[in-house]
Amino acid sequence: HNFARYSFDGGKTYTLIGESSNLTAEHLADVWRKLAQEFKDYNNIWGYDIMNEPYSMHPSAPWVNIAQVVIDAIREVDTETPIIVCGDSFSSARFWVEYSDNLRTLVDPSDNLIFQAHLYFDKDYSGQYLNSYDADGITANTGVERAKYFVEWLKRYNKRGLLGEYGVPDDDPRWLEPLENLLIYLRDNGVPGTYWSAGPRWGDYKLAVQPSDNYTVDRSQMSVLEKYTVTAGNESG
């Protein structure tokens, strides 16, 4: 989750990949070559997600070029594991065509790429949910309308995709209808998704689905998510 950036000073400043000779596409590719060499024979590795949410890349090093260098490096040592490529501009599903259309030119000799988009329902698409449901003008189809840009792109170019992040707050039950409509749309179009977020570290974070009261009380989002949950080996469910 470093957005195509790296800090050399403990987080005080961040350098973009491709911004200088200190941090190039080849450096990232070298990391992935080594990771693929190490983990290629692990049957529990579903795919290599090469970078989370790149955005505002340096003009001399667009994300599509960096991704191609990484793909080439991985395929030097692993020809089988799927490679997951996030879109540009924070992987936005809504703005996929504007910022990530060029990813369709990526070449994988193994023909095993999965493109990943992210989607949040708030007005500014950020997932911070700073305003209320009413203030952001949410409708039952907000998620579907945003997902269509990505899903239709996948269909148009015969690509495989994943909605790698989506989530709604637990502070208003009305969020559950657009969430469910999104999941129905993804299911009907054969696009899997992974919810953001889960796990005990999130505390009272309003998008989290970690159960409370010693795992005895589910968060409200689970009433929808459980209807669409599948596990490995049951992807058609």
Regions found by a protein language model. Give the residues of each.
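Aromatic-lined carbohydrate-binding surfaces of glycoside hydrolases
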Residues: 1-10
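Cytosolic regulatory and coupling regions of membrane transport/channel systems
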Residues: 227-232
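Short secondary-structure capping/turn micro-motifs that flank functional sites
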Residues: 4-5, 170-171, 202-203
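Extended hydrophobic/aromatic segments used for targeting, binding, or gating
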Residues: 194-195, 205
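Short glycine/proline- and charge-enriched loop/turn segments
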Residues: 9-19, 130-135
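Surface beta-strand/loop "capping" patches
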Residues: 235-237
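Acidic carboxylate-rich catalytic motifs and surrounding loops in phosphoryl-/glycosyl-chemistry enzymes
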Residues: 165-167, 196-200
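Extracellular glycoside hydrolase catalytic/binding regions
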Residues: 23-47, 51-191, 207-226
